[in-house]
């Protein structure tokens, strides 16, 4: 009976040790993957198209504003046959950014009063 109990404890210990090593390997792989994604994002961020500039070459290259990414909007100018695409911020997102800025400012005042 003691032998079975000792064998069971040994088996559980080995199993937990091997699963911990596997989790460490997965965590390391996740960290490496996350770092590579961050590096790609930084490289991509350097090539973004500023607001009101032509984005017809790459419609997903618009820069980010404080909270939201600008959108490549295409239209035909009056009396023209050529399509023009520029990076623009939709009005509803512009208003949301203004509201968030005012809320942040108001929150700072409340923190100053009570903090």
Curated annotation (Swiss-Prot):
**What keywords are annotated for this sequence in UniProt?**
Disulfide bond, Knottin, Secreted, Signal, Toxin
List, in alphabetical order, the Gene Ontology terms for molecular function in this entry.
toxin activity
- The residues the entry assigns to the signal sequence are 1-20
Q: List the GO terms this entry assigns under cellular component, sorted alphabetically.
A: extracellular region
One short Pfam family name for this protein? Toxin_35
Q: Does the keyword Manganese apply?
A: no
The organism's superkingdom is given as Eukaryota
**Where in the cell?**
Secreted
Q: Which residues form the propeptide?
A: 21-44
Q: In which tissues is it expressed?
A: Expressed by the venom gland.
Q: What InterPro entries does the record tag this protein with?
A: Spider_toxin_CSTX_knottin (IPR019553), Spider_toxin_CSTX_Knottin_CS (IPR011142)
Q: Tell me where it mainly resides.
A: secreted
PROSITE patterns, from UniProt? Answer: SPIDER_CSTX
Which residue pairs form cystines in this protein?
Answer: 48-63, 55-72, 62-87, 74-85
For whether the record's keyword set contains Protein biosynthesis, the answer is no
Q: Which family does it belong to?
A: Belongs to the neurotoxin 19 (CSTX) family. 01 subfamily.
Q: Share the domain note from the entry.
A: The presence of a 'disulfide through disulfide knot' structurally defines this protein as a knottin.
Name of the protein this chain belongs to:
U3-lycotoxin-Ls1k
